[in-house]
Amino acid sequence: MRDLKTYLSVAPVLSTLWFGSLAGLLIEINRFFPDALTFPFFSF
């Protein structure tokens, strides 16, 4: 039961950090490449 409580307290923290960093990454990509349907660093 203690392991379940540990999991339930760790999972929201990790998911918040993950989604927060993902949102920050997407915001920075949109700041440097606004309105990009295809990203310039993938084109040859």
UniProtKB/Swiss-Prot annotation:
<comment type="function">
    <text>May help in the organization of the PsaE and PsaF subunits.</text>
</comment>
<dbReference type="GO" id="GO:0009522">
    <property type="term" value="C:photosystem I"/>
</dbReference>
<protein>
    <recommendedName>
        <fullName>Photosystem I reaction center subunit IX</fullName>
    </recommendedName>
</protein>
<keyword id="KW-0150">Chloroplast</keyword>
<dbReference type="GO" id="GO:0009535">
    <property type="term" value="C:chloroplast thylakoid membrane"/>
</dbReference>
<keyword id="KW-0602">Photosynthesis</keyword>
<dbReference type="InterPro" id="IPR036062">
    <property type="entry name" value="PSI_PsaJ_sf"/>
</dbReference>
<comment type="similarity">
    <text>Belongs to the PsaJ family.</text>
</comment>
<dbReference type="Pfam" id="PF01701">
    <property type="entry name" value="PSI_PsaJ"/>
</dbReference>
<keyword id="KW-0793">Thylakoid</keyword>
<keyword id="KW-0934">Plastid</keyword>
<keyword id="KW-0472">Membrane</keyword>
<dbReference type="GO" id="GO:0015979">
    <property type="term" value="P:photosynthesis"/>
</dbReference>
<keyword id="KW-0812">Transmembrane</keyword>
<feature type="transmembrane region" description="Helical">
    <location>
        <begin position="7"/>
        <end position="27"/>
    </location>
</feature>
<dbReference type="InterPro" id="IPR002615">
    <property type="entry name" value="PSI_PsaJ"/>
</dbReference>
<keyword id="KW-1133">Transmembrane helix</keyword>
<keyword id="KW-0603">Photosystem I</keyword>
